[in-house]
Design a protein with these regions (language model features):
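Glycine-rich, acidic loop regions that bind phosphate or pyrophosphate groups
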Residues: 1-50
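Generic enzyme active-site microenvironment
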Residues: 5, 91, 144-145
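Residues immediately flanking
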Residues: 8, 94, 174
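Thiamine diphosphate
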Residues: 13-16, 22-24, 28-34, 100-213
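Active-site diphosphate/adenylate-binding microenvironment
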Residues: 54-138
């Protein structure tokens, strides 16, 4: 088996990713050229892919359709997907909730899910949503943040209000660093340095002239 890397830049080879062949250039043109070079169509049963797709969808929606309190992450993802149109944009900050959105939020158009997955930059969700709202003022834009990530750049609410940007910020609040808790537990460590106090986010938003709910 050979791994073919198709991208606009060279691969970053490491111990887990080492492609044998690299195609560097325009991705669409590269894929078209590869398809033409293959000649006859490959004998692939697309029904197998459809079964995998259907199983993934079933798993996504199964728990989302079982209302609970507090809400399950799957239910939150499903509710937001239902509220947003196919061209609307969500911008994810970095936290443990991001995993649920990355796995379960169905995307129908390119660049409608914005997330900094590799660098895991906390505080990126709100600025990303602001830029999306500037570029696409007629689309719905939602920034989805944990409380920790939101507070790292929360002062930009003032900028968003001043520029009259059309966006919503959803804060998933647990008064702690959830991703770090998960990683500490996975490494066998006890919780340490994870919990903190937050402001009243409704009043905090209103202090900048935004609407808090």
């Amino acid at each position: 088996t050979k791994v073919i890397h198709v991208n606009y830049k060279s691969a970053q080879v490491d111990q887990v990713y080492f492609p044998q062949i690299e195609v560097v250039g325009d991705i669409a043109l590269s894929v078209d050229a590869l398809a033409a070079a293959l000649g006859s169509k490959l004998d692939i049963d697309l029904g197998d892919f459809e079964k995998v797709r259907d199983n993934v969808k079933e798993n996504i929606f199964r728990l989302a359709e079982e209302p609970t309190f507090p809400m399950r992450p799957q239910e939150i993802v499903s509710e937001i997907r239902n509220l947003m149109g196919y061209h609307d944009i969500i911008a994810l900050d970095n936290g443990v909730y991001k995993i649920w959105f990355a796995r379960n939020y169905l995307a129908f158009q390119p660049n409608t899910i914005l997330l900094d997955n590799a660098l895991a930059t906390m505080g990126a969700g709100l600025p990303s949503a602001m830029l999306a709202a500037l570029i696409h003022p007629n689309r719905k834009v939602m920034s989805i943040c944990g409380d920790g990530g939101f507070m790292m750049n929360s002062q930009e609410i003032e900028t968003a209000v001043r520029l009259n940007l059309n966006l919503v910020v959803l804060i998933l609040n647990d008064n702690s660093y959830g991703m770090i808790r998960w990683k500490q537990a996975g490494s066998g460590f006890a919780d340490w340095g994870l919990e903190y106090n937050n402001p009243d986010f409704v009043k905090y938003a209103e202090s900048y002239g935004a609407h808090g709910h």
